[in-house]
Amino acid sequence: MDWELTKWRKERLNREKPLITFFHGASVRVALAYPNTYYVGMSSLGFQVVYDVLNSHKHASAERFFYPEHMFKGLFSIESGTPPGNYDIIGFSISFELDYIRIPQMLSLGDIPHYSSQRESPFPLVIGGGSFSFYNPEPLADFFDAIVLGEAEETLAGLIDVVHNFKLSGNKDKGQLLKDISNIDGIYVPALHSHFSC
């Protein structure tokens, strides 16, 4: 990580009033990503609520990622400067259609394959959510292992519990993890559903 990125991260953190308590020993690490700049992402109430809900769960610890304002040589969390591939879940909070194009760009910056079908390992699990899921998640379905439909606050605890238990089991089968996640109300797993083309 270059010094410009380190300086940028520290400037943002120094301006914030910390309201979140982190569970540093949490078993499920979440990279919470917003596919727009820091200022746009931090003005999203939904993004902030999800960040709080995740960090309030006893098994979870979430750090934030934003689309780089300047093209840094990679993608790193605001809190610790960790790349997204080191997390169990990469969760995208998507509010606007114009942000769709930044999702594969952010995955590329994090050295994460774009499509769910290209990611064989169960982790990091790439999940989408936000207002886009209220009307039509299909344009982004191929990118995500799972999509949270509707209000995330009601679904996240179950998701974290499933991932926590899966990790404890020592299982490495991504297919089984996706089946387990698909049993949670409000979660859509595109790989387990047929896609239709015109």
List each model region and its residues.
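Short helix-loop-beta junction
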Residues: 49-61
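Flexible, glycine-rich loop/tail regions that form catalytic "lids" or insertion modules at the edges
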Residues: 20-22, 31-34, 76-78, 88
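Long, low-complexity, serine/threonine- and charged-residue-rich intrinsically disordered N-terminal tails
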Residues: 32-37, 43-44
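Conserved alpha-helical elements of sugar-nucleotide-dependent glycosyltransferases
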Residues: 42-50
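Glycine-rich beta-alpha loop elements in corrinoid/cobalamin-binding modules
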Residues: 67-197
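Residue-level recognition of beta-strand->loop/alpha-helix junctions
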Residues: 34, 64-68
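Residues that mark the start of a beta-strand
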Residues: 27-31, 59-61
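Short N-terminal or domain-adjacent regulatory/targeting segments
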Residues: 1-25, 71-76
